[in-house]
Amino acid sequence: MNSAPRTASLWRYDLQQSLKGSFTARAHGLRLTTKFALLNSEGKNFGQLQLRGLSIAEFESGDRAAVLTHTEGRYRMVAEGEEILNATPKGQSVDKLEISCGGRTYEARVSFFRNVAVASYGRGGGRAAHVSGGLVGRSYQVIFAPEDGCALPAAIFLLWHVAANRRRAYRMGRPMGRGAM
């Protein structure tokens, strides 16, 4: 695998176009869960995001799949054996990330207590993806730039990152320290 993530593959492009820039994630069942149903703007299920702890998640939509991982301070999204996105914390910060996808770099800001994450195009650029969750973290609204081939993967990554780390942030009373995410 080369270190530069590729641009959007065909499976992401058609999914991204059909979603038209937004989707909702809803937790399954009545208990706190780690499995989210992903719904389009008409409320129809188009996939799921299964969280498997803080270090791995699986995104599935039809016959498409991607695995999200966190190891040694680096996040990756891999689909069909190819890295399509990677992210690293900016400096010592636990709430700022640098996301790379398809030759582009995005700056992401995360607030675990507010249950919000935003990925923007560099300094002062517009938003590529915005994830905002409900008070208890069982529902998330996701908005992304439909014309940007990497905005959907960035949105899915941010959804996982916020949902997986939010509960831990509340238990600890503050965001995780360096290397704990």
Residue ranges: model-predicted function:
Residues N2-G47, L51-L54, Q92-M181:
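Low-complexity or membrane-interfacial segments used for flexible interactions
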Residues G73-S100:
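Helix-adjacent hinge/juxtasegments
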